[in-house]
Amino acid sequence: MPTLLIIRPSNRPQQDIQTCHAAGWQAQVLSPIEIEADRSALKKLPEQFKQADVVFWVSPTAIETAAPHLNFSDGPRAHITVGQTSQHTLAQFSPYPVFSPEDGNDSEAVLRMPIWKNLPPNARVLIIRGHGGRDFLADKLTELGFQIDIAEIYFRRPHAIDWQHFKTEDIAAAYITSGEIAREFFHQIPPQFSRFFESLLYFTHHPRIADALRIVGAKHVKTVTSLSAALSSIPQRSQAVNPVEDN
């Protein structure tokens, strides 16, 4: 049975592992970055939450870190997420409808959503994210006249991968979910595995991450809509381990 490497923080891969098993794949997790909650920011978050007219959640990690600290009955009823996975995650905490874009899974797609036209002028938008997140949406919403409040409630910390017992046998591809993770992962690769990881097939869900992978040295990168789509695009193991052309 082929193995897919899931390269992401260890708090996130459970659903990915289930997806792999359902598709007939083994899954192995490597975490070059881990998530650390910002306790000080979380203490301030409930008051920011109460004052907001709408909340934008940037990721499932932002939701899982922040939501347990909030009373949703005290906050706004308008909630926006960057994608379907975040939407489903937030639905476990919020009794209110959750909106996400239908034509993408990034800040650009969120900005195109019609909900912004239905909000009152000068509405206060709370963006809940990790430290060092993109400012694209905040900047664009400010230009549109919204008041922006940003809660950076977690850190992404480099985490040393244990390579002592790592084996390349049966590893057919990898799935990676951020450019920052791609850069840290390739930074940690030992010399004896460098050629293997340069030639491995990588899947990701966004062209920006695909570009980051190519910059750090990945030769074979494919952009897909989801992990399920990635797995279904390789019906046979031989297709995963042989060189392929980039999209």
Regions picked out by a protein language model, each given a short descriptive name:
Residues 1-247:
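Signature of uroporphyrinogen-III synthase
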